[in-house]
């Protein structure tokens, strides 16, 4: 396509150009806005809100279809865009000392239009989000900013939240440890920061609430997703599931593990690494059945197939220190994209239990799904969705087809001068690792910082051992608990002179790597070093009491070791220099003042983290503790900055940060994220990938051609080969994998779309009952439809009355409605036409309902409404759970329809629809039955003035 671009220009450049006139308007307003006082600047928000409200006056937005609602809001906001962006730019300059560059204004416009902005590492994505967030919050309908972990959500809400608060908007933050009331309060804010999982689980929990007071979220409006590729692509196949515990057949998992251990690969079973699946051969079935003393693994009375297949998968496809680690008698999943551990996350369908049996740890209970949704369908609930990432263009087609999101590449503020060197491929793993270690040693000799990306915990430790042999000091960042708790600290100093950092999957790491080191972060760590021992409650686990839950696997989280926060302090070598005596004295005085004001050993760790975060920013504050800490923070920062600035210049002369990739990832995007760690904001840098024929990508997706070349030329194990053919083969392999996984995600989306339509319908019905919107009318509908279904089951309108099954009809109706006992006569009913019969029975059923309503409300006013709400919610929840299981079973077996020349997806849609209709029939019938049958107990109030002497 290069000739096309030369002829017509780069389409991305053309896209960006259309925003230039708007940016020119904003720049023209800059001097005028800068002349405003703080109060005048803040008052602009109320002016904008009124102008937007005037535009929307008389429009019932909630009554509009989603696309029309978004269009109306965008038209209203269009009149204030340039002024609003100019105001946010000035506020950021005053409050946090950052001014939006023109390219960041373009990024803000792209996000406001509901697109994905591709912005390179270090280009200030976090700051860009303040622009569209402020603008869209002017409607009062709320904005959600989504990050990949709690730490980033908290950091961004504290840091960027200062800009919004300065301008008079409220800022909310959703964290794992919050109570429902705290969540509701934070969701009610103008702008709310949170993680994708917390927002998704809150949505599911809201749709399991038993009274309206438990709801925490309001209607969705606008969402900005940071690291959008990580959430909408990498996590797309992972559903959010809320489940309940069911009994575990632990002995079956243990026995199946023994069978899997005895079975041999390629004899008893075959492994498809590409599909991540296993298949038993005929010999395998026979051997397994003999070992288990059963005639059939699929026997309904004593099924074993599910357990054996999972045990073989656990043996062959799930490796310790790659897909999971073992900690505190638990199997803890490692996120393959970020390298973080995920306590509380479990593989479903018995797979986690199979891995527990393999590792001989306690086998935990199985779970039953109560509610679930994929990220794909969750984020499509927002009328307007936008995202930011450093790498999106490689997935542009997927974003367009599944999410209807356009991708626009935002130009960098300074030209990228990084050198990306060609890949080196080695015959063996050992040859590759030796060469990586040699390259690190060469760079380290000159003091040039090196960042090495690995794909698993196991491989990071192999390299770490090699570097120890060579006497090269280095930092290790992987999912092991002892490394995770120092994550930000390790990344913050990765650009120091002579620094060597080994990291497992750098995607999504939130701290910038600055050449020479990050003085701001180091100054914050210095405050942490002295404040935590003085202020934090003794023996409080990392991130407060909730962290204990995370480390026991009872909740979801981002993996920190259960180490006392007082002990989890930065190592001394991170600091660039010893502080001067006067600064040390000033620091001691600030800590003493904080202790005097707040109390020794009295604060939760999160509270102290927040104190340090606010002290290190520039927002206005009246808090004397923060004022003292801010003063000393600035003094420490200045001393550290002298050293880091000097180191920065030295590292630039050496060539900047050198990034080494030790394996090509399945997605080019993740490789690009690793490369993007070098050469940020115009700094020099270089990258190189070292590969071997044993790497998963080459081994599974077409390394035979390269292996053949190496054999033909008798290449030694420590001799690398570089060639255009090789690079092309690797890129083709990655494209194959990307296409393969895209097809899988597309299939997940298509199948979940069936569930999504059902989910929307059932949740809407549930919300109608929960919020009590005329429950009597809902129940009358249920009665009407239930009687209709019973009549049609026994009466064929095209047949004469003599052929109607009237005795059976009467029996069914009297079982449903006891008040109709002895009220129905088959002879009289036979005199009606089918239509008249139906109308007569419906009117009798409704009369019986009104009689019941009068009787029940006489016991306690409005008791009937409460009963209706309870029975509707109870039946929807119970039958929806059963329906989810049925749909899972249908999904598992529907693929076999392909062998019968039928489209499995169409079959799934049709049969799933039938199951859903049947569930709705059961919900209605069960609710009607319960309302006609339940007997409330009458408990008369006791008159305290009356005491019967007989009982004294």
Swiss-Prot record:
Pfam family, one: SecA_DEAD
Cited InterPro entries: Helicase_ATP-bd (IPR014001), P-loop_NTPase (IPR027417), SecA (IPR000185), SecA_CS (IPR020937), SecA_DEAD (IPR011115), SecA_motor_DEAD (IPR014018), SecA_preprotein_X-link_dom (IPR011130), SecA_SF2_C (IPR044722)
Record's keyword terms, sorted: ATP-binding, Cell inner membrane, Cell membrane, Cytoplasm, Membrane, Nucleotide-binding, Protein transport, Translocase, Translocation, Transport
Transmembrane feature ranges: none
Residue sites binding ATP per the record: 104, 122-126, 512
Gene Ontology biological process terms in this record: intracellular protein transmembrane transport; protein import; protein targeting; protein transport by the Sec complex
PROSITE patterns, per database record: SECA, SECA_MOTOR_DEAD
Chief subcellular location: membrane
Membrane-protein topology: Peripheral membrane protein
CDD domains membership: DEXDc_SecA (cd17928), SF2_C_secA (cd18803)
Enzymatic reactions: ATP + H2O + cellular proteinSide 1 = ADP + phosphate + cellular proteinSide 2
Annotated compartments: Cell inner membrane; Cytoplasm
GO cellular component: cell envelope Sec protein transport complex; cytoplasm; plasma membrane
Gene3D superfamilies on file: Helical scaffold and wing domains of SecA (1.10.3060.10), P-loop containing nucleotide triphosphate hydrolases (3.40.50.300), SecA, preprotein cross-linking domain (3.90.1440.10)
EC numbers, comma separated: 7.4.2.8
Entry's Gene Ontology molecular function annotations: ATP binding; protein-exporting ATPase activity
Keyword Zinc: no
EC top class named in words: translocase
UniProt subunit comment: Monomer and homodimer. Part of the essential Sec protein translocation apparatus which comprises SecA, SecYEG and auxiliary proteins SecDF. Other proteins may also be involved.
Family designation: Belongs to the SecA family.
Matching HAMAP family: SecA
Function in brief: Part of the Sec protein translocase complex. Interacts with the SecYEG preprotein conducting channel. Has a central role in coupling the hydrolysis of ATP to the transfer of proteins into and across the cell membrane, serving as an ATP-driven molecular motor driving the stepwise translocation of polypeptide chains across the membrane.
Name of the featured protein: Protein translocase subunit SecA
Organism: Gloeobacter violaceus (strain ATCC 29082 / PCC 7421)
Source species taxonomy: Bacteria, Bacillati, Cyanobacteriota, Cyanophyceae, Gloeobacterales
